[in-house]
């Protein structure tokens, strides 16, 4: 597989994160590739963390440019198992997908 989250390609039995409903979650992503990635989170809307702890608009997809490091934040208010993946189908099929558990 060509893509990974925390060194793990494809869906695993263990979620990237397991959080309780109501928790604030922050996920830092680093695009170490030469390609853009439309990172999409199911089940929640998030805000991109900007300079000086400011937050961007609500969204469910963030386009990350090559070499970009970004952090998203959201309140985990929707219990379930939620997919986080690159919205470019070839990238997701090549391993750029994981999941979050909200209990």
Label the predicted regions.
Residues 56, 78-81:
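Short, glycine/acidic-rich beta->alpha junctions
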Residues 72-78:
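Short, hydrophobic beta-strand segments
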Residues 62-66, 94-103:
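Extracytoplasmic/periplasmic copper-protein system
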């Amino acid at each position: 597989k060509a893509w990974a989250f925390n060194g793990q390609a494809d869906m695993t039995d263990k979620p990237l994160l397991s959080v309780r409903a109501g928790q604030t979650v922050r996920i830092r992503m680093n695009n170490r590739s030469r390609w853009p990635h439309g990172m999409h989170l199911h089940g929640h809307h998030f805000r991109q963390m900007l300079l000086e702890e400011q937050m961007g608009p609500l969204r469910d997809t963030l386009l990350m440019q090559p070499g970009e490091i970004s952090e998203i934040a959201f309140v985990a208010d929707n219990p379930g198992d939620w997919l986080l993946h690159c919205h470019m189908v070839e990238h997701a099929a090549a391993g750029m997908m994981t999941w979050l558990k909200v209990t």
